[in-house]
């Protein structure tokens, strides 16, 4: 009887620990994916590396998020943001923050650069597991194909 209860207790503890672990899903190299998007997707202008601090300020990612990205070197709204969060819940939070940032950019573009608003509307914003990707480019389909390759 003692062995049965010991085995039952061990099983319950393992289930409890597994439930607390969170689901991080697929892990990606954020810099590699950002570089791949920069090198293989057309943009309206040259792309320059964005300081991580700038992205963190704009997107307010949860603690423990690895983030990389590029921005347009001119007045265009082209951008790449790739983030690997600690878990799916953090990724959902970052996705919502990124959507808010994208909506703010759309309002700004509507006032100052109406032509850019349509590009922002067609942007790739994707969350899969603990990964969040934003890509504003001239070819959303090409960006989507690259991202899907990393998330398989």
Residue ranges and their predicted role:
Residues 15-19:
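C-terminal motif of bacterial Sec signal peptides marking the signal peptidase cleavage site
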Residues 1-4, 8:
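Positively charged n-region of N-terminal signal peptides that target proteins for export
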Residues 71-103:
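Mature extracytoplasmic domains of secretory-pathway proteins
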Residues 46-77, 89, 120-121:
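Short, compositionally biased low-complexity segments enriched in polar/charged residues
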Residues 91-128:
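Short Gly/Thr-rich strand-loop-strand
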Residues 115-152:
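A short, solvent-exposed beta-edge/loop patch
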Residues 21-24:
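Bacterial signal peptide processing site
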């Amino acid at each position: 009887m003692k062995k049965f209860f010991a085995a039952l207790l061990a099983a319950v503890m393992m289930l409890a620990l597994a439930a607390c672990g969170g689901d991080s899903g697929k892990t990606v190299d954020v810099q590699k994916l950002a570089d791949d998007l920069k090198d293989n997707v057309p943009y309206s202008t040259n792309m320059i590396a964005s300081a991580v601090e700038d992205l963190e300020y704009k997107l307010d990612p949860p603690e423990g998020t690895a983030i990389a990205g590029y921005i347009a070197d001119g007045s265009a709204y082209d951008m790449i943001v790739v983030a690997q969060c600690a878990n799916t819940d953090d990724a959902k939070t970052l996705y919502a923050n990124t959507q808010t940032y994208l909506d703010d950019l759309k309002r700004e573009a509507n006032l100052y650069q109406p032509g850019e608003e349509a590009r922002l509307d067609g942007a790739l914003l994707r969350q899969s597991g603990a990964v969040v990707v934003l890509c504003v480019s001239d070819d959303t389909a090409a960006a989507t194909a690259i991202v899907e390759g990393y998330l398989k």
